[in-house]
C-alpha cells in the first residue's frame, strides 16, 4: 500500500482550521455579551480565515505570549535535561533584603539592599523580550517531568478519501505513560484547550 502523503498537516494548523469553522461560536463566547465588541462576527470570521491562511503559508508572526511560552518551555527542558540553553538566556534572580532605619513616625531614613544566596526566580531573555518565572514553579514543573523526553517530533499517516494525510507535531514532554503539552495562559478555565488537536494527534502518532 502506498503510504506517501498527499497532504502534510501539523496540529496547530488543525487548531486554526477549527477556529475558522467555529468563529461564530468563539465570537459569541468572548464578545456576545459586549455592547462594544472590537469587531463584528463577520470581521472576526475574516480574521480567523486570514490567520488560517497565514498558518498554511508559515507566515512569521510576532507574539509576546508565544515568546513567553517558548521561553518557559525551554527553561523547563533545560532543568529536566540539566543543560544550558542555546536559545534562551537564563539568569538567576536572588532574594534581596533591605536593612535600614526609620524615624519615630516610621518614615525610612535610609536603607541598604543586601543580596542573599536564595534563588527566588529565573529571568529568561528570548527574542529581545525578558520574562521572569518563580523558581518554585520551575522546580515543580521540572520535578514532575524528571526523566521525560523533551521536544519529540511525532508523525503518522491518516488514510482519507482525499488521499493520505501526514499529521505531525512536537511533544513538549513525553513520559512513559503520558503525553504533555505545556501551556502558558493569561487566564484559564476548565476545558479551555479541549478543542485543540495536540491531544488527538500525538497519541495517534505514537500508536502508529
Predicted regions and their residues:
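Metal-dependent nuclease catalytic cores that hydrolyze phosphodiester bonds in DNA/RNA
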Residues: 1-171
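Mg2+/Mn2+-dependent nuclease catalytic core
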Residues: 147-208
Amino acid at each position: 500500500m502506498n503510504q506517501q502523503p498527499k497532504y502534510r498537516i501539523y496540529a496547530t494548523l488543525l487548531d486554526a482550521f477549527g477556529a475558522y469553522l467555529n468563529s461564530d461560536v468563539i465570537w459569541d463566547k468572548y464578545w456576545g455579551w459586549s455592547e462594544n465588541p472590537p469587531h463584528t462576527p463577520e470581521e472576526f470570521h475574516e480574521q480567523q480565515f486570514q490567520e488560517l491562511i497565514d498558518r498554511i503559508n508559515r507566515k512569521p508572526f510576532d507574539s509576546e505570549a508565544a515568546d513567553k511560552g517558548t521561553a518557559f518551555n525551554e527553561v523547563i527542558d533545560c532543568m529536566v535535561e540539566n543543560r544550558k540553553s542555546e536559545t534562551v538566556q537564563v539568569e538567576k534572580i536572588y532574594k534581596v533584603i533591605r536593612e535600614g532605619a526609620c524615624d519615630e513616625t516610621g518614615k525610612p531614613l535610609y536603607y541598604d539592599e543586601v543580596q542573599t544566596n536564595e534563588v527566588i526566580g529565573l529571568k529568561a531573555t528570548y527574542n529581545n523580550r525578558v520574562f521572569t518565572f518563580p523558581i518554585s514553579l520551575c522546580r515543580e514543573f521540572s520535578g514532575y517531568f524528571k526523566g521525560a523526553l523533551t521536544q519529540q517530533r511525532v508523525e503518522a499517516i491518516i488514510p482519507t478519501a482525499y488521499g493520505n494525510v501526514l499529521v505531525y507535531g512536537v511533544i513538549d514532554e513525553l513520559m512513559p505513560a503520558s503525553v504533555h503539552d505545556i501551556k502558558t495562559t493569561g487566564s484559564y478555565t476548565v476545558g479551555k484547550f479541549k478543542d485543540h488537536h495536540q491531544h488527538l494527534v500525538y497519541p495517534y502518532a505514537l500508536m502508529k
